Design a protein with these regions (language model features):
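Extended, Lys/Arg-enriched charged tracts that mediate electrostatic binding to polyanionic substrates
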Residues: 115-129
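Charged, gly/pro-rich active-site loop segments
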Residues: 97, 105-119
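Helix-start/capping segments and mature chain N-termini
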Residues: 1-105, 127, 134-338
Length: 338
C-alpha cells in the first residue's frame, strides 16, 4: 500500500499506476488494454470534442474492516451508461465488459485503495468518448471506453455535516426532454456558472427548479434531492433528473427501515413541511441540507443545523452495506479483492 496520509485526502485527482481501455472499431469492441499513460491521443475533429459525444460514470471501491475490497452496485452503473449510450447514439458497453474492466482496474491499482480507518475511498471513473474525426453533427464510427481510478477523501470537507443551498432560477441544468437523465458532460458544463454563483454567495451548492414551470424541486447541483417527513422519504420525479444509484439505494434502505417512499413532483412550498432534507450521490453519499434560501422571495426553508436522525440512520445503513458491516441482503456489493 502506498505511504499516503489517507485521512487528509481531498476529493480530487491523483495519478495512480494504471488505467484500462477498450476500443470500438469496425462495429465491435476489441480486447481490454492496460495502460500506464494518463493521456489520450485524440484526433482534433473527434466527436467528443466538438459535439459532446461523451458519457461517464462514477462509483467507488471500499477497503473494508474484514480486509476485503468491495465495489458497490457496478451493474447499475453499467445499466445507466447503456441508457446514456442509447440517448446520444453511442455503442453500448455490455455489463460483462463494464464489470470486467472495473474489477481489473481496481486490482491493478490496489496499492492506491485507502485504508479502512481513513474514511477515504477509491473513486472509479468510467469514460466513453467518440474518437473518430467528424465535421458535421453525426455519431462517431469509433469510440474509446476507459476507466481510471483515484483515491479520494470526502466530497465535502466537513464530512457528514449539514450545508446550506440556494435556489437558482436564472439557470437550468437541463431541459425537460433534454439530456438531464443521461450522465453526459454537457449537463455539468451547464451547471458550472450557477454553481460558481452559489459558492460566491456562501452556499455549498445551487438548487435547480424544474425548467418548464419553475415550480418544482429538481436537482441540487450534481446530486438528487430528498426530503423526510412523517416517516416518509420523498424524492422528485422528473424527466430532467439523473437517476441516481445512491438515491435508488436509499429508497430501498428507507423501505427496509420501515419508512414509506414517495417519488413524485415536489412543489417548492412543500419544503416548509420537511423535517429533514438532503442531497445524495456517489461522491458524498448523503449531504444533509441545513437550509435552502430562495433569494427571489426572501424565503428560507430550514431543516436544522445538524443532520437529522433519519438522514443519519440512512447514511449509516448504506455505508454499513458498502463496507460489508451490515448484511447486504439485496446483493449490491461485489468483492473484487479477497
Amino acid at each position: 500500500m502506498k505511504n499516503l496520509d489517507w485521512g487528509s485526502l481531498s476529493f480530487g485527482y491523483m495519478k495512480t499506476d494504471y488505467n484500462v481501455r477498450c476500443y470500438y472499431r469496425d462495429g465491435k469492441w476489441g480486447e481490454i488494454e492496460v495502460c500506464s499513460d494518463e493521456y489520450l491521443k485524440l484526433h482534433m475533429a473527434a466527436t467528443c470534442l466538438h459535439y459532446g459525444q461523451e458519457a461517464f460514470e462514477g462509483l467507488k471501491a471500499y477497503r473494508c474492516k474484514d480486509g476485503k475490497v468491495r465495489v458497490f452496485r457496478m451493474e447499475e452503473n453499467a445499466a445507466r451508461l447503456q441508457s446514456t449510450c442509447r440517448g446520444i447514439m453511442m455503442p453500448e458497453v455490455s455489463t460483462e465488459l463494464f464489470c470486467e474492466m472495473v474489477k481489473k482496474v481496481v486490482r491493478l491499482n490496489q496499492e492506491w485503495i485507502p485504508t479502512y480507518e481513513s474514511g477515504a475511498t477509491l473513486y472509479i471513473r468510467p469514460l466513453l468518448i467518440g474518437t473518430s474525426a467528424q465535421v458535421g453533427v453525426h455519431p462517431a464510427k469509433e469510440y474509446c471506453f476507459l476507466i481510471f481510478v483515484t483515491p479520494v477523501g470526502p466530497y465535502f470537507k466537513g464530512g457528514f455535516s449539514s450545508n446550506p443551498y440556494v435556489i437558482i432560477r436564472d439557470y437550468d441544468r437541463s431541459a425537460p426532454l433534454g439530456t438531464g437523465k443521461y450522465k453526459v458532460g454537457g449537463n455539468y458544463a451547464a451547471s458550472l456558472f450557477a454553481n460558481n454563483l452559489a459558492h460566491e454567495k456562501g452556499y455549498a451548492c445551487e438548487f435547480y427548479l424544474d425548467a418548464k414551470e419553475k415550480k418544482y424541486m429538481d436537482e441540487c447541483g450534481a446530486a438528487n434531492f430528498f426530503g423526510i417527513k412523517d416517516n416518509t422519504y420523498v424524492t422528485p420525479k422528473s424527466t430532467s433528473i439523473l437517476p441516481s444509484i445512491t438515491n435508488k439505494s436509499l429508497m430501498q434502505v428507507a423501505e427496509d427501515l420501515g419508512m414509506k417512499v414517495e417519488r413524485r413532483p415536489i412543489p417548492e412550498e412543500e419544503l416548509d413541511t420537511f423535517e429533514e432534507a438532503g442531497a445524495c450521490g456517489t461522491a458524498a453519499v448523503i449531504s444533509p441540507i441545513s437550509y435552502i434560501d430562495d433569494l427571489d422571495t426572501g424565503k428560507r426553508y430550514s431543516f436544522g443545523e445538524k443532520p437529522g436522525p433519519m438522514s443519519k440512520k440512512l447514511f449509516d445503513t448504506l455505508r454499513g452495506i458498502q463496507y460489508g458491516e451490515i448484511e447486504d441482503k439485496h446483493g449490491w456489493t461485489t468483492v473484487v479483492i479477497e
